[in-house]
């Protein structure tokens, strides 16, 4: 469950290291985001010379979430950290590499580029 003011780790090589959620897409009253949901983030820490800089506002998709998520088969998936991948305006990843595992729910949400770049899909 990601909400406004949640701090997240960036799981790609776009240059950002830590971001903070400032908006959850999905209507006025939408409070929480889960695996595969898009959010707007503000970059809080970045590496020098990266694609994105500190204070940049970007779109992102949640790829790992600490709060467990129930699947259709009755199993649950949970991760050790909250992580996102930064997106451009077309919904494609800004980085060229993805670090760490990503959830299978991204395939259902049509984020095929992220799924293909990820080293492991759980």
Swiss-Prot record:
Residues in the signal sequence: none
SMART domains given in the database record: Ribosomal_L14
Any single GO BP term: translation
Swiss-Prot/TrEMBL keywords: Ribonucleoprotein, Ribosomal protein, RNA-binding, rRNA-binding
GO CC aspect terms: cytosolic large ribosomal subunit
UniProt-listed InterPro entries: Ribosomal_uL14 (IPR000218), Ribosomal_uL14_bac-type (IPR005745), Ribosomal_uL14_CS (IPR019972), Ribosomal_uL14_sf (IPR036853)
Keyword match Ribonucleoprotein: yes
Keyword rRNA-binding: yes
Role played: Binds to 23S rRNA. Forms part of two intersubunit bridges in the 70S ribosome.
UniProt similarity note: Belongs to the universal ribosomal protein uL14 family.
Name by which UniProt lists this protein: Large ribosomal subunit protein uL14
Species per Swiss-Prot/TrEMBL record: Pelodictyon phaeoclathratiforme (strain DSM 5477 / BU-1)
